[in-house]
């Protein structure tokens, strides 16, 4: 029996979740061993959506990762009439299917960048992939930013040389706080409504975006795992985290999509940092 595109995409997002959680737990173990501490582990919580589907939220609060969440979800049903006009292909009957993975990491150390990543596959009367990854350092380092971008550029160039400059630009434009006239972090890539007419190619690209993240971000975290930091640096991190909150509540499409489709509120707002200061 032929496996549907929906199932192919959903299975990959589950596999990627397992790979990411395993790698992040390994980092916690490496740190805990040197400090004589018990390493943190992910706690998984399942949820069901009224109307169809559900997901699993994986959350870890450790000594390295102050809060890291990896969500997978597969939901289906009908958009509300007022939301249909905003989604391509949903105008007529409002029916949709959406599966994806979403990851947000907030680190205890203010020297280690926060990171956001997601990839998804959506079907209405049309179908497409979307997603990307972006880095939010509080103390940016050029070599670190370059390494993060290089990983995604390599994934993009494998498929289309126009992808990286286009998706980088879309990331810069998307992760921008208009009310403050400043970017959120140092960017990465962001793509949406990707349908080249070749599902296998678009799916393979989306897989490689996930693998790129898996190759580069743990390396960045490990490079600063044991660097000392000051209370002043931590204070600055907490204040800058406020920008993260502002963006996610005011502009984030995933937050809006989740709330409009009656998703799990805890999973949707998992992206918010555990501690933040507004001065």
UniProtKB/Swiss-Prot annotation:
UniProt record, GO biological process: protoporphyrinogen IX biosynthetic process
Reaction equations catalysed: coproporphyrinogen III + O2 + 2 H(+) = protoporphyrinogen IX + 2 CO2 + 2 H2O
Subunit structure of this chain's protein: Homodimer.
Keywords: Cytoplasm, Heme biosynthesis, Metal-binding, Oxidoreductase, Porphyrin biosynthesis
Biological source species: Rickettsia felis (strain ATCC VR-1525 / URRWXCal2)
Highest taxon of the lineage: Bacteria
Binding-site residues for a divalent metal cation, renumbered to this chain: 106, 116, 149, 179
Organism placement in taxonomy: Bacteria, Pseudomonadati, Pseudomonadota, Alphaproteobacteria, Rickettsiales
Protein name: Oxygen-dependent coproporphyrinogen-III oxidase
Class in the EC hierarchy, top level: oxidoreductase
